[in-house]
């Protein structure tokens, strides 16, 4: 009798593992097909070993060649970014580059490394769902949505620090969930190290810190109320701060000291002369309804950037297709790509509605609700502010905030009741359509 009761859970576990493996295999197949420059966000060109363009590619080569952090007289290009991703890229260079050999071939290997990080994001997302005791068809559907959804196909092939940052953020969130269940020094030290490493990958990883702080405060007050003891928690909080703050902030503090670089520095655009400039678009166009061209586009048409100034739809477009990287050869494929963008919008809104419901449900642990709700809110609000501070088309991209999808999937997983059929069909439709397009239209 006991084995028959356990069987459904075991079947779900096996099915989820198959989904994870299939998703990883498909991502690797996609990465093998496309060049490392398929998603060319701030890549720059490869270095000639004498001069450096300041893009992500030459940053990696600089670290490999000189084995030191940037020592120029000022910060420029991508060198203001913390170096962890680029250091790992330099290590891959050391493994695969031979003097006089193909630099491009080594960048392809780095692309594979980045794709493995994308696969790991899905695995950590599944583990978070398991920690939150999400079960049944809901667990399978959400796992499939993470595994086969479109964003991680292209994000894994983009040679930027966004994918690794998202992985380390997700791992931090997992540890905070475990700590909230049972506060232990070992768990909080892991969380501190992971957050610090995320910040050493990209400074904006710190945006999940307010949510972590809310969890700490809630558990602290709850412990005082229930047990009247606070000293063990104070030691744990001290350990978290002493590890995460000095290590995570070390690179930006170095640059502030050496180059007087602001702690929140971002490489500036060209102002109103930037061909992507959209700062003169109205507030309604930015935050209201998207243009018809944007609604029915499967890529950004750079000759008309102001048609793509709407933050919401630009986020959905890049979630599905980055800036339009698929090779769409006929009307059927173009129509399917537009439908994928629409399904990303519908899926995100459905997950958001479920997460909001979870946030206001007293049946879910308050610490988890704070982590997911505050985490999503702070990251997304910061993204909107960023899009206005730097009004360019390229600043509205899901790559900056993919961690919000982990918050939404976890939040929906905790939603009371079964997943409605319409939502399940929407998520599965998105997963299957994205997989078909990224398999058929990669090159």
For each of these PLM feature ranges, what is it?
Residues 101-107, 122-148, 166-167:
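Transmembrane-helix signature of polytopic, membrane-embedded enzymes
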Residues 132-133, 172-190, 198, 220-223:
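Membrane-interface transmembrane helices that cradle and orient dolichyl/undecaprenyl
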């Amino acid at each position: 009798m006991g084995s028959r009761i356990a069987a459904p859970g075991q079947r779900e576990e096996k099915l989820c593992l198959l989904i994870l493996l299939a998703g990883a295999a498909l991502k690797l197949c996609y990465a093998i097909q496309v060049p490392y420059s398929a998603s060319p966000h701030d890549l720059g060109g490869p270095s000639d070993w004498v001069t450096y363009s300041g893009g992500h590619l030459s940053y990696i080569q600089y670290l490999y060649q000189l084995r030191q952090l940037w020592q120029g007289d000022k910060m420029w290009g991508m060198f203001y970014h913390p170096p962890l991703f680029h250091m790992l890229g330099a290590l891959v260079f050391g493994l695969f580059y031979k003097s006089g050999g193909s630099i491009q071939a080594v960048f392809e290997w780095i692309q594979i490394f980045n794709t493995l990080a994308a696969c790991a994001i899905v695995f950590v997302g599944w583990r978070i769902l398991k920690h939150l005791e999400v079960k049944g068809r809901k667990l399978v559907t959400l796992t499939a949505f993470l595994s086969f959804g479109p964003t991680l196909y292209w994000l894994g092939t983009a040679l930027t620090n966004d994918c690794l940052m998202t992985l380390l953020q997700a791992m931090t969130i997992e540890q905070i969930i475990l700590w909230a269940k049972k506060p232990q020094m070992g768990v909080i030290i892991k969380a501190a190290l992971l957050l610090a490493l995320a910040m050493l990958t990209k400074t904006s990883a710190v945006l999940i810190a307010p949510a972590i702080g809310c969890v700490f405060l809630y558990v602290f007050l709850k412990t005082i109320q229930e047990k009247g003891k606070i000293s063990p928690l104070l030691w744990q909080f001290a350990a978290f701060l002493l590890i995460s703050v000095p290590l995570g902030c070390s690179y930006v503090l170095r640059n502030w000291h050496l180059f007087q670089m602001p702690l929140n520095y971002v490489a500036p655009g060209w102002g109103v002369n930037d061909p992507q400039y959209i700062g003169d678009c109205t507030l309604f166009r930015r935050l209201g309804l998207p243009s018809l061209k944007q609604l029915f586009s499967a890529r950004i048409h750079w000759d008309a950037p102001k048609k793509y100034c709407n933050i919401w739809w630009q986020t959905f477009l890049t979630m599905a297709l980055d800036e339009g990287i698929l090779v769409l050869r006929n009307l059927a494929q173009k129509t399917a790509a537009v439908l994928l963008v629409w399904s990303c919008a519908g899926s995100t809104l459905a997950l958001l509605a479920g997460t909001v419901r979870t946030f206001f449900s007293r049946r879910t642990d308050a610490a988890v609700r704070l982590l997911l709700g505050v985490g999503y809110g702070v990251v997304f609000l910061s993204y909107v502010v960023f899009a206005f501070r730097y009004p360019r088309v390229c600043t509205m991209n899901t790559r900056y905030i993919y961690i919000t999808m982990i918050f939404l999937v976890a939040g929906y997983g905790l939603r009371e009741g079964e997943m409605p059929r319409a939502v399940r069909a929407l998520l599965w439709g998105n997963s299957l359509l994205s997989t078909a397009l990224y398999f058929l239209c990669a090159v």
